[in-house]
């Protein structure tokens, strides 16, 4: 009899736990994805803060030349970063218990791999949690779909690119100047500026910013007057009100006359779908471009593609970019190799 009561009590506790986890009445929705999201993101955030402040230098290139990225070693907020895992580790899974000591783990950049792996799991679970909450509220799933764009971008630079290049040391450093260094080296090695998927990403990000500003300014400029001159326009809106707060016909008429009639949306639903889809698709393409360049399917090479009747090269902007790429490649990882691969792998051009 006692055993039966205990089983019923435990089942009741589990049922109450399940109900609490999936309840949409909580101030913050947890969900089953949240059960994994919360510890992984807390771990990634905690280790990042500690490592950014106090972790020792890391032998990123695997040549016994540690690189400092931490505040206590003389860096500031801009120059500081969590330095990627050492090239000596490559793609090996490198938890703390795989190192001979904590000092070795820190020297080889173990915190970077710990942060990146937990962060990746956390943001994937956050996306799943968005879908889960939408499902429970009877909403459509497009919030999670939109969030998949930054998830894809983070996955590309933190997971796919290191896999393609064969080492976590090629991942993006976790810092401001480290991000810029990653971008410069990426351009030098992969010519990303000449990759069509990157161009689509630029169109998505800048186009999305433009469309967001246009939409916000049009709505703000065509608000329906509900207040006096002495009150804030924002006081004219009541949360949950049924009627429109702005005149879409006026906004449509203005924009149609400013550009041309069919440049303006006359359907609010299709307008907002467009505002969401444009940057999301652009960022998807950029993430896809990073993922293909990870395996050295690089941007277009139009170097020395224009010549005169005598066979002499007429430089184009592609050649100017190529010169910049060579200069950047010479400068990075100065002691890891003695000569840039692009210069060392071809016959030296004749100077005379």
From Swiss-Prot:
Binding residues annotated for [CaMn4O5] cluster, in chain numbering: 170, 189, 332-333, 342, 344
Matches recorded under PROSITE patterns: REACTION_CENTER (PS00244)
Name of the featured protein: Photosystem II protein D1
The protein's assembly and partners: PSII is composed of 1 copy each of membrane proteins PsbA, PsbB, PsbC, PsbD, PsbE, PsbF, PsbH, PsbI, PsbJ, PsbK, PsbL, PsbM, PsbT, PsbX, PsbY, PsbZ, Psb30/Ycf12, at least 3 peripheral proteins of the oxygen-evolving complex and a large number of cofactors. It forms dimeric complexes.
Site entry: Cleavage: 344-345
Co-factor note (free text): The D1/D2 heterodimer binds P680, chlorophylls that are the primary electron donor of PSII, and subsequent electron acceptors. It shares a non-heme iron and each subunit binds pheophytin, quinone, additional chlorophylls, carotenoids and lipids. D1 provides most of the ligands for the Mn4-Ca-O5 cluster of the oxygen-evolving complex (OEC). There is also a Cl(-1) ion associated with D1 and D2, which is required for oxygen evolution. The PSII complex binds additional chlorophylls, carotenoids and specific lipids.
Binding residues for pheophytin a: 126
Binding of Fe cation, residues: 215, 272
Site (Stabilizes free radical intermediate): 190
Enzyme superclass (EC): oxidoreductase
Subcellular location: Plastid, Chloroplast thylakoid membrane
Gene: psbA
Gene Ontology CC, one term: photosystem II
Main location: plastid
Any one Pfam family match given in the protein's UniProt record, by short name: Photo_RC
List of residues binding chlorophyll a ChlzD1: 118
Listed CDD domains: Photosystem-II_D1
Transmembrane segments: 29-46, 118-133, 142-156, 197-218, 274-288
The EC number(s) this enzyme carries: 1.10.3.9
Keywords: Acetylation, Calcium, Chlorophyll, Chloroplast, Chromophore, Electron transport, Herbicide resistance, Iron, Magnesium, Manganese, Membrane, Metal-binding, Oxidoreductase, Phosphoprotein, Photosynthesis, Photosystem II, Plastid, Thylakoid, Transmembrane, Transmembrane helix, Transport
GO biological process, one term: photosynthetic electron transport in photosystem II
Positions of the propeptide removed during maturation: 345-352
Other noteworthy facts: 2 of the reaction center chlorophylls (ChlD1 and ChlD2) are entirely coordinated by water. Herbicides such as atrazine, BNT, diuron or ioxynil bind in the Q(B) binding site and block subsequent electron transfer.
Membrane disposition: Multi-pass membrane protein
Residues engaged in binding a quinone: 215, 264-265
HAMAP family membership: PSII_PsbA_D1 (MF_01379)
Organism: Chlorella ellipsoidea
Post-translational modification N-acetylthreonine, affected residues: 2
